[in-house]
Regions:
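Glycine- and acidic-residue-biased ligand/ion/polar-headgroup-sensing regions
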Residues: 43, 52-68, 75
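A short, N-terminal "cap"/entry segment at the start of jelly-roll beta-barrel domains
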Residues: 1-33
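Histidine-centered metal-chelating micro-motifs
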Residues: 46-48, 67, 79, 83-88
Length: 109
């Protein structure tokens, strides 16, 4: 049996770092501060360009469609943003849900 199991249906969505972004924490590594989360972006939301100074970001789009720098990402897209590298702005063309892993504390600048 796995040492840690959780069900998303047993968790609650929490406010994210921007209005219109919600987070559902599936797991937090108490040693590194890293998190595995579901992220929900409200349709029409634009998240400004930003960096994550303390963590690499790995994201897989579960549903929805968003645009960044003229590229459109849809269900099945995977992307990686290295720690400290500016990315965005992101525009949610529809509601977007992603499975995202930050390998260190989730901070935004």
């Amino acid at each position: 049996m796995f040492p840690y199991v959780t069900l998303a249906k047993d968790k609650s969505w929490q406010p994210g770092p921007y209005d219109g972004v919600e987070l559902l924490v599936l797991h937090k590594n108490e040693t590194t501060g890293g998190v595995t989360i579901l992220r929900k972006f409200r349709e029409g939301l634009t998240v400004p360009a930003h960096i994550h100074p303390l963590a690499n970001e790995y994201a897989y789009v579960l549903s929805g469609e968003w645009e960044e720098s003229g590229a459109v990402y849809t269900t099945g897209a995977f992307f990686f943003a290295p720690k400290g590298v500016k990315h965005g702005p992101h525009h949610a063309k529809t509601e977007v849900i992603s499975l995202t892993v930050f390998d260190g504390p989730l901070t935004v600048q």
